[in-house]
C-alpha cells in the first residue's frame, strides 16, 4: 500500500475524438487490478478510521480535489465499479459509506449498483446528491464551492431516501392520467425491490 502500481493520463482536448473516455489508465497487470485497488486509501485510512466513515468517489481527480479541500477520508474506485474486494478493504476501517459518484445517468446507475452491493454486505450507505444541472462530479463541486461541497456531504441521505427521490419524484410530471399512474406504479415496484435488498435493520 502506498506504492506506485499504475498511471492515469488525460487525453488532451486537441486529441479528444470522443471515441474513448477522457482518462486512460495503465492496462491491468499482476500488480494493478482496478477491482482490488482503491485510489488514495494509503493516505485516507487514518482519517477513515478516526472519523468512522469513508467518502467514496468515482475518479482520481475527485479524490485529489476532496483531499485538497480537507476531506481526508476520501477514496476513489478509479472509474471502475465498486467490488467486493474494495468493500473488504474498507470493512477493515469502517462500515459507514458515503457515496458520491458522477452526476450523469451512467454515474447514477453505477452508484445504485454500489449501494446494492454495499448494503448487501452490511454497510450503512448514505448518498451525496447534486441538484440536476449543477456539478458533474466531486472535483467540479470542490473547485466551485469547497464549503458547499462539505455541506452536501453533511446532508447525504440514506440509501432508501435516495431511491425514493430517484424513482418517486415529487412535483409535476410530463405524464398525465393513466400514463402517470403506470409510471408511479413502476416507480413503487422499483423502490419496493430496492427496500427488499437493503439489509440494514435501521433502514
Q: Can you say where each PLM-predicted feature lies in the sequence?
A:
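Phosphate-handling DNA/RNA-contact segment within nucleic-acid enzymes
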Residues: 1-93, 97, 110-111
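C-terminal or mid-to-C-terminal helical accessory/interaction module adjacent to the motor/catalytic core
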Residues: 124-202
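Acidic, metal-coordinating catalytic cores used for nucleic-acid/nucleotide bond scission
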Residues: 61, 82, 101-111, 129-136
